[in-house]
Amino acid sequence: QPAYAYSGLCRDTNDIGNTYVEIDLTNQRMVFYKDGQLLVDTPVVTGCVRKGHATPTGCFALDAMRSPAVLKGPGYASPVTYWMPFSGGVGIHDASWRSQYGGQIYITNGSHGCVNTPKDQAAIIYNNISVGVPIVVYE
């Protein structure tokens, strides 16, 4: 019998359940489903590939939620309204300093690894998600 480090939301053909976030790094899009209903489908800007800040891939769980927050790192302190970390210091948040999302922005002008999201879309996610919800990040 295997020992599981984590338990799925259920043990059948859909073990992440019907509420989850998908982040598609190649297409720079994020979708959020709640109870099987699509609530958000938005362009995003993820980690800057050229600077070595690629957003980590894998299956994660939402670690926490904070509103507002100040994101701090070497040489920056960025206030955000919605902060939803899922992999250490990497998370989903609004980015008031951006006017465009999607496309190839992430290659040369991406984030430090986080998923920069339009504020209105980040608000929808924040107001409908809870800690522990699966976050699936893939290329």
Which residue stretches match the model-derived regions?
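Cell wall/extracellular polymer interaction/catalysis modules
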Residues: Q1-C59, A64
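Exported/periplasmic cell-wall-interacting domains
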Residues: P2-I16, A54-T57, R66-E139
